[in-house]
């Protein structure tokens, strides 16, 4: 039995989502695709991540944010769904911070991965 699910995220920026997925080592495609849902239906997604079992997962724009679309019974990623969403959120936030600090004239000086899995990010700006 299929357990097709749409999971709400806080992801709003397509480019940052692409960077986060790439950081996680996932291969994605942004052409418009349909994800098979159950036996006889499909769901259009904006970003497709192929899985070996042909039950692919994707992200679909829903008015103001992206939703993850997947059949949870056929989830075939190296992490559980919860760990995947945590890692994706962390990478998305990282790229969001980098992008925003660049807009304000900062550059990344250092990043340190902490024992608890968090990332300590140090940015700097030179005043002339």
Swiss-Prot record:
GO terms for cellular component: chloroplast. It is found in: Plastid, Chloroplast. It holds the Pfam family DUF1257. The keyword rRNA processing does not apply. Its main location: plastid. Keywords: Chloroplast, Plastid. Belongs to the ycf35 family. This is Uncharacterized protein ycf35. It comes from Porphyra purpurea. The lineage of its organism: Eukaryota, Rhodophyta, Bangiophyceae, Bangiales, Bangiaceae. The gene is ycf35.
């Amino acid at each position: 039995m299929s357990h097709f699910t749409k999971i709400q995220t806080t992801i709003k920026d397509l480019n940052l989502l692409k960077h986060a997925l790439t950081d996680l080592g996932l291969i994605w495609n942004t052409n418009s695709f349909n994800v098979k849902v159950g036996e006889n239906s499909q769901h259009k997604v904006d970003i497709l991540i192929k899985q070996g079992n042909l039950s692919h997962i994707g992200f679909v724009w829903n008015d103001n944010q992206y939703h993850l679309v997947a059949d949870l019974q056929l989830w075939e990623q190296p992490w559980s769904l919860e760990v995947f969403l945590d890692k994706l959120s962390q990478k998305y936030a990282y790229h969001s911070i980098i992008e925003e600090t660049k807009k304000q004239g900062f550059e990344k000086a250092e990043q340190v991965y902490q024992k608890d899995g968090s990332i300590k990010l140090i940015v700097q700006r030179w005043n002339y």
